[in-house]
């Protein structure tokens, strides 16, 4: 009786704060994903990360049910971060109990228990001992980057978690912030190591393959447990050989060559059309998250000097946004990369320029300005400077770690040097890829002998494979149109996405997606694509240019 009363009270409390879209989504899920009580009580578990990325909940609902069915497992939610105060813990408990977002959405597709990483006294003691051992062994930033615990690599996760949480450009080992962040990362490691020891976990879904979110991933794949990262536009299976999502660019060249000639020709033509749209200044072409174009018409007086010296453009990255998204780079973070280039500016007779992205995050500009003050040979350009203007004024070489300028400047005939072997353009030869720091140094000292001949067809092939061949229309019939309808990329992470998706939902697409996910999971392939969807559904979700 008490449970019935509490359910009614919870419903009354929740009614005014639950969006109509969320309620529609929950009711829809309860209709289409029906599991027996026995299935929800079974011992094996499938872990699904709980977060507020509402568009991803749509994908989670499908993957959770497919994994639960295939493994005969119950779906268990988990949160990434432990509550740091009693107030936070009570707030989270209340939300879970009344089914407030996002917990109501998860409950509707079969998620029962939600695990929070709260450590016991014994676990905290182990984490303290582990911290003392790890911290004493850190002599450099590369030591942090290379950190392994119980043979499992987590250094990159520790590194990027700190940069993001504190919005710092680099790590200072002795700082209270880093000590706190490292302790927290190691506590998460201890918790998830013990959890996987004590529970029969058959699969895990994570939201990110970087930051602390990926600590359960690293421990799981070391034990042979499959891990997935699914969202509205992609679905990846991670293992010991593939620790990062979005890394399929390493096979772009060979996969493009294996396509039928007609598809290759049509793909190159479509890539040409879309690149031209980007270069005309159109915002969001195959980059839904972008809000400004760096290829607008020139709007500044001359920006580069008319000297005979080589003109270098450094395309700065956001310092806090996961430098290790694809793995390790030549430098442990973007700050160290810029500092190296600042030192190189003092050794060379070039005109050095640095530019932030028009969409730079708060704090980035100030850090770049500090570098310009430290290294007077660096000249800071306006963030809204047009790349067309810079090319017209004589930029000779562009430097990036792994940015999109790699293909953009190559398409316009300008050499680009990447400071990473884990960059999205690595399968092709239209950029120069520095192997290590010494190779990078020699390339910069000998720009006149840069070993590069740009084949524009390669640039188009890359663009086709990266942005066209795999459509984003996995769970939506028109992802780009939906983002526009919602009012921008960020709006998909609000409950508004539920209504838009439900208006597009069809039983035929629903069944095709379930079948495709089953095929994908059983295949153990790295990425879900047209191979896993039977025709004609594959033609709708993964269209091939005609």
Predicted feature residues:
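A short, glycine/small-residue-rich beta-strand->loop->alpha-helix junction that serves as a flexible
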Residues: 50-60, 206, 321-328
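A donor-sugar binding/catalytic signature common to diverse glycosyltransferases
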Residues: 212-217, 231, 383-431
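Conserved catalytic-core segment of nucleotide-activated headgroup transferases in glycan assembly
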Residues: 280-370
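Histidine-anchored nucleotide/phosphate-binding helix
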Residues: 54-77, 331-345
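Donor nucleotide-activated moiety binding/catalytic core segment of transferases
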Residues: 182-197, 350, 360-407
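Conserved nucleotide-sugar donor-interacting segment of glycosyltransferase catalytic cores
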Residues: 188-243
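Short loop/turn segments at strand-loop or loop-helix junctions that form parts
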Residues: 50, 79-82, 232, 311-321, ...
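Conserved N-terminal ligand/cofactor-binding loop architecture of enzyme catalytic domains
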Residues: 1-45, 49, 66-186, 232-293, ...
